[in-house]
Amino acid sequence: HPKVKILYLCANQSAGKKINKFDKTITKKNLPKISKTENVNWNKIDILFTALPNGEAQKIAKIIPFHVKLIDLSADFRLNDFNTYKKWYGINHKCKHLINNSIYAITEFSRDHLREKKIISCPGCYPTSIQIPLIPLIKNKMVKVNNIRIDSKSGYSGAGKNIKKKFKFKNLFESISAYGVGKHRHMAEIDQELTKVAKSKVRV
């Protein structure tokens, strides 16, 4: 973005390396080398993007100064209920005091309120693709909320960077496989947000 200046790229296990070592398509010059989070001068930062495993963004959120806005891609600030978070992700939430200062951000529906919150919690891939068409339908009472069935597809990159045999290209090419049917983690945030819109309990 022309109005964004990248001051730090952080990945504690890859400190000292250049980002294009991991992604050759990144051709932008003058990007900083990867550094450790502990070496960041927060006084120079306005916005922090985090793309970390669930549970890790909470640790960062606890230490950054109040003036730094956090845009988080994990599930750490998507769910309002801490018991629901623990049920689906298996860990206790460490930043309960920050939940009220976060917003579940599908821009098409939350744009007017993004400036009000410190933490912008980005939804998962499935919830985004599902809610963008469903929310207008629910608002206009065009679907029955007690019988919503969803059949969604995504690319394998959503499974993370760790190499798994079943996610190797030769095993995926021209094929499709089901996973998380009836128990996908993203169900919790979809239920939460659609319930708000429907003003009655929604279970997908």
Each predicted region: which residue ranges?
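N-terminal Rossmann-like NAD(P) cofactor-binding subdomain of oxidoreductases
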Residues: 1-181
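Oxyanion-binding "anion nests"
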Residues: 181-204
